[in-house]
Amino acid sequence: GDVFSAQFCIMASGCLSSANMPKFDGLDDFAGRKFHTGRWPHEPVDFTGRRVGVIGTGSSGVQAIQEIAGQAEHLTVFQRTPSYVVEAFNRPLGDDEQRNIKAHYQELRAAAKKTFGGFNTVMNDQSALSVSEREFRQRMEEAWNSGGIGFLAAFNDFGFHEEANKRGQEFVRDKIRHAVDDPVTVEMLLPYHILGCKRLCLGTNYY
């Protein structure tokens, strides 16, 4: 390979460069197939007709659950703590969209450098506590329907004011209550921790 000389070497491989393999009794005795989202096989995995268990409802778990549920005969989810899941609105990009994005790479990167976290999301300059209930819900609906991590930018104090955050939490919990029919399942899916204190999960029809 190539050899480089530099005054400083910054290793930016990140904390996710190696999979965190769980250790618990009985794992090695399991007779079925085991998969880890951090070491997913390159070839397709078919869960058709299978009984599947997924451990965990973090970002990777949420994305796996929604895909496996459409194939497996039966899916059991082992959850410790429910997550706030916002729609990702993943979809194939059309040729025109791709060409337009590629033609404006420089502008998009320049704009991202001026935003919080490097994402092309504009933070609302209003407090969640400064608006009426109608205005709050209107802004939150807009953010919800846009999807993605920009949801947290709906108001500027979700990350700084407890009461503002509670207002955002309850909005998401209401969305879950309306999406899930079974009251027992609803209660298991409702998160009560601070909105945004953990990585916001993005899903596609998760609820």
Segments from the language model and where they lie:
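N-terminal FAD-binding dinucleotide-binding subdomain shared by FAD-dependent oxidases/monooxygenases
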Residues: 1-28, 43-44, 57, 72-207
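Conserved beta-strand scaffold positions in the cores of enzyme catalytic domains, especially
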Residues: 32-35
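A short, basic/flexible loop-to-alpha-helix module at the beginning of a structural domain
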Residues: 37-49
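Short coil/turn connectors at secondary-structure junctions
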Residues: 49-50, 73
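Beta1/beta-strand and adjacent pyrophosphate-binding region of the FAD-binding site
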Residues: 50-58
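N-terminal Rossmann-fold NAD(P) dinucleotide-binding loop
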Residues: 61
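Aromatic pocket-lining residues of Rossmann-like dinucleotide-binding sites
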Residues: 64-68
